[in-house]
Amino acid sequence: MSEQNILKTPKGDRIAIVSGLRTPFAKQATAFHHVPALDMGKLVVNEMLERLNFNKSEIDQLVFGQVVQMPEAPNIAREIVLGTGMPVSVDAYSVSRACATSFQAIANVAESIMAGSVTVGIAGGADSSSVLPIGVSKKLAGSLVDLNKARTLGQRLKIFSKLRLKDLLPVPPAVAEYSTGLSMGQTAEQMAKTHNISREDQDALAHRSHSLATQAWADGKLKDEVMTAHLPPYKSFIEEDNNIRKNSTVEGYAKLKPVFDRQHGTVTAANATPLTDGAAAVLMMSESKAKALGYEILGYVRSFAFSAIGVEKDMLMGPAHATPIALDRAGITLADLDLIEMHEAFASQTLANMKMFASDKFAQEHLGRSKAIGEINMDKFNVLGGSLAYGHPFAATGARLITQSLYELKRRGGGLALTTACAAGGLGAAFVLESA
């Protein structure tokens, strides 16, 4: 292990994570069908604080994110503060970094603690694929503005006369990159072809993810980090993730047809993450504050890094770019890690990133490094399953990865973990965590 570099405050305090919690993750239009992301965010933050019997007056800041924005509540963080009984003086702002949003929220709180401006903070994210901001066409939107300014019936009728039936159709949120028009699935398909990721290998990874997640729930390993969510009108509840295939078989995956390239593709609904609803949060503070309040520390943020690459090709290669930076900042190598948690947006994207971890050619041509960071030991990789099984509420996944890693390190008696994710826009994130 090379020289250690640990994130600290000016007073020498490490950045501690005291608690992490999430809702169960639910497939679109199931358990959280009519529950907005804001309500899920309030639910998980309030439950986390209640479990700790935490004095809300101790909280200095809340940073939260949401990828699929709610127009009526653009600052989800502030609404969570106001909706959970925290003092109105608690600072709150929202962030968005696509699928790495809660990674960004956690990094922001960590930086505030390091700067000494915050002692206690909450970070996290929530997203709903069931309660969506359905928009209108640009032509209808422009006409509505013009109607508001029209003064006579004749002017209004003239505006209406220019509209066609197609202009009145609802417009769902975009699923493609604004700059390229490519969807995440199309990029996943491109990465599979470019890096020779077979359908069989993708299906095998998906089967592994579902099998390990099934076992994790059966063994009770997730009970402390996943709350039971009681839903209005409080006649039902959800206590486990409902996307996990408990009877997963490799043969079952082979039956599905490709989605994004129907003739020659390999990416299917089974080896990709589904649209998912859920929320996750972590409670952070300086090490000395945690000890002064008498709370057990789950772990520490050792380092973090973000990366950005082109979006035309290999847009989801963020982990392979961000991880070497985070490892260098932590003063460690890949071999020093006890756990590796990588967001499985698609099996093809995950396997392509794993390949690049071990590729000297990739390191030399894309990272400016003489050699690769190393091959991933599968005994350390996504040991409880990953996003392919749990699902992926965009803004919540980073907090899930970090919480899940710290609890697993604790069960194993300590160590170091890497959590990393790709994100839309060619972005990537990586965190190195240290068990308390």
Swiss-Prot record:
Gene3D superfamilies noted in UniProt: 3.40.47.10
Parts forming coiled coils: none
Cellular-component GO terms for this entry: cytosol
Pathway membership, UniProt: Lipid metabolism; fatty acid beta-oxidation
Keywords: Acyltransferase, Cytoplasm, Fatty acid metabolism, Lipid degradation, Lipid metabolism, Transferase
Main location: cytoplasm
Compartment list: Cytoplasm
Active site: 99, 392, 422
Reaction(s) this enzyme catalyzes, per UniProt: an acyl-CoA + acetyl-CoA = a 3-oxoacyl-CoA + CoA
InterPro entries cross-referenced by the UniProt entry: 3-ketoacyl-CoA_Thiolase, Ac-CoA_C-AcTrfase_FadI, Thiolase, Thiolase-like, Thiolase_acyl_enz_int_AS, Thiolase_AS, Thiolase_C, Thiolase_CS
Pfam families: Thiolase_C, Thiolase_N
Regions crossing the membrane: none
EC number, UniProt record: 2.3.1.16
GO biological process: fatty acid beta-oxidation
GO molecular-function terms, A-Z: acetyl-CoA C-acyltransferase activity
HAMAP family the record matches: FadI
Role according to the record: Catalyzes the final step of fatty acid oxidation in which acetyl-CoA is released and the CoA ester of a fatty acid two carbons shorter is formed.
Oligomeric and partner information: Heterotetramer of two alpha chains (FadJ) and two beta chains (FadI).
Similarity field: Belongs to the thiolase-like superfamily. Thiolase family.
The name this protein goes by in its record: 3-ketoacyl-CoA thiolase
Organism for this UniProt entry: Pseudoalteromonas translucida (strain TAC 125)
Lineage: Bacteria, Pseudomonadati, Pseudomonadota, Gammaproteobacteria, Alteromonadales
